[in-house]
Each structure stands twice: as structure tokens, then as C-alpha cells.
Amino acid sequence: IESGTEILDLGTPNDLSKFIASSGYTVHNTKGENLDTDFQPYLDTGVDCITAFEIFEHMLAPFNILSQLKTQKLIASVPLKLWFASAYWNTKDDWDKHYHEFEQKQFDFLLEKSGWVVKDRLIWASPDPKKIGLRPLLRYFTPRYYMVYCERA
């Protein structure tokens, strides 16, 4: 994505969207709306690219917004499902729950069915050296995050 590109980041401002803005891009963020139901204002914004960093796992139906976005480019990341851990679920905050933790093939299928073609992908692990135990050890070797660059089909 060329420097100076105008981007809509689905989600409230975060460290990554701030970094992107500081790198020469114009970044607009959503305002914390429920994007399962209140996504219409963001469908045709005229931006060059949409980013969505770890929001689709929080949505009940990400297909709805993914299939209707009018932009031609999408960069999105999701946490991958871990075989040794259950989905994240904050009992005190309805916005902080993972309704979906995708396998790579599931997220690719969602993107395909909503009209996107994955052009590039990146998968990485996310170890936490401060924690001790079997699960923290497995996080050194098990892919945890998945990011894709897509274009409209």
C-alpha cells in the first residue's frame, strides 16, 4: 500500500492504527459502534483501503460487513484458534469476547465467500516470556496470529 493512502481502520484508535498514521498514511477509525448492526456509514467511504486488526473475532456475523464494503483493498488480522486454549471470554465486558477464533482455512473461506481474494498472508507465534508453564511454552511454537492482504474479487 503506497504511502499517503487513505485508510479506514475498523475499530477504535489503537497502537497499530497510530503507527500507520505516523508512517505517512491518513487513517480514520470507527467510533466503537457495534459493527454487526451499525456498519452502514462505513460501507462506501471513498477510502483506498480498509484495515481491521483483530475485530472480526468479536463480531457475531463478520460476513455482513465484509461482503458489503466498497473498497478494493483489505488488510485484516485475527487471532488463530489454539488447540490447547479455549476462546477468550471476558465475563465482565460484552465487547471483550471472542465469538470466533478462526483456523486459517476458516478465515480464508469467510473472505472468499464475502468477495475477497487473499493476495498475501502472514502467520506468526506470540510467546510470552514472562509466563511459565506448558501453555506459555506451546505459544513459542504454535502460530497465534494471522494477517491477510486482500483485494476484491
Descriptions of predicted regions:
Residues 1-2, 42-46:
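Glycine-rich phosphate-binding loop signature in dinucleotide/nucleotide-binding domains
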Residues 5, 48, 72:
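Conserved acidic residues
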Residues 12-19, 60-153:
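S-adenosyl-L-methionine-dependent methyltransferase catalytic module, highlighting the catalytic core
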Residues 51:
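A conserved beta-strand element that flanks and buttresses the S-adenosyl-L-methionine
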